[in-house]
Amino acid sequence: MSKNILVCVAWPYASGSRHLGHIGGAYLPADIFARYHRLIGNRVVMVSGSDVHGTPITVRADNEGVEPIEIVNKYHKEFLGYWDKLNIQWDNYTTTMTDNHKKVTQEMFLKIKENGLIEKNKSIQAYDPIENKFLPDRYVEGECPKCNYLEARGDQCDSCGVTLDPEELINPKSKLNGNKAEFKETEHYFLKLSALNDQLSEWLNSKKGWRPHVINFSKSFVEEGLQDRAITRDLDWGVDIPNNELGDGKKIYVWFEAVIGYLSATKEWASNMGDPELWKDFWLDENSESYYFVGKDNVPFHAIIWPSMLMAYGDLNLPTNVPANQYILIKGEKASASRGVGKTLNDYLDEWNPDSLRYALGSILPEQNDSEISENEMIRRNNEELVAAWGNLVQRVFSQYINNFDNLDFDFELIDVDKNILDQANTCFEKTGQFIEKVELKSALQTVMSFVNKINAYLNETEPWKVIKKDNKRGTAILYSALTSIDACASMFTPFMPSTSQMVKNAIVRNTQNNWELNEIKKGAELKNIGHLFKKFD
């Protein structure tokens, strides 16, 4: 029986070009996971969109002397190009600027307020006396009080991952001019996280199979006691506060509003499908599953704050899993768009076949620990694994099959060595599927590539290019078994490398059309020559 699978992916700030860390951290893993579940017959909705209200956008707009909307339009368009080139298959990729998103955000705000878990309170907020304005959290930088990282932001430390308020920073400075930030009292709406502490703790303790760094961080954070958190700010760029009692110059703050995008994007998808009620299948059905693909800096917002908001709202499904990835490191430093660490994604897309790039990233996904990446290692994996192992396997079996087609005799019997390689194909399907369902995608990819090496070993042992010259039936049996195994690999590679895998599958004629099981290749059918799948880097 098929399941409803909601795949929620981090909303990128529409403030700058993306890099490999973003793709390997969230977007590629989500796409692999979603593609697999579609293949096995589950009903999948994968949603995200460009976050247009994040303060990095206004920071960039200020620096460039333009309006925020100009920055948003530029980078949202650029992001759409990424997804197209990388074959990221969204059911809905939208923005937080739509009327639908604003409506859903305001409805959630009012419902939580009605439930008694949003209230007005006074807070101290960073203020720039020279500019005579309150500073959004990301306009403040200083030393982290936890790990002493010198470039911590007013909302979070990129080094240790702790969420912060600007007043907690040591020597806080305004990013507008580098001068010392002052702090003044202002009134805002607060989410009463403290009232949800016990409920959230109980829920976290019930979760099984989460990545250790995600569950351990989340439990530790909650054990310290959740503090009520302001969900509005003194801003002129953001979603309006409904029934605002605070006065002008305040908006709903982005950390509260952006995560609501998962719900608003699903509702938008349902409307696009012609049935506005379809979203309920993924948010109200208790058998539906939801997975949140984010980087580790987003763990507090997706494993703590968003579940708290859902609890405060009531009735909506809580996350099934938050398989957050660690960081991809460039020479030991976290890739960062805002700090210019690492080549942009466009740099790689200009040079790499998208499937080669997906494979290189998929093979080093930082699922448990930070992963160091270098272009030399990516090139090695492309040349040795894609070109020399997988691509060469396809090429030599296809060429032997096509060149000897007139002499093939399909009235053959398989012997033990042939049956063994096909049994291994069945085992590979099972193991690979199990790894993907546990969101252990790197292990899944390694499992398929290991099977590729076993097929190559099978060919080296059986030598069909020699056997076919003196025993047509035996040579045909070997090539048929190898081709069946290649078809299986193409199926299993499909979530990781959809374009080249489909090329292989389109060339093969089958009696069956299984997506995640061994297929029966049609005996006597011609095979299409597809040429080289991948290019070798010098």
Which stretches of residues belong to each language-model region?
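N-terminal, positively charged nucleic-acid-binding surface of large information/translation enzymes
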Residues: 1-203
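Basic, alpha-helical terminal appendages of large translation-related enzymes
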Residues: 1-4, 45, 121-131, 142-161, ...
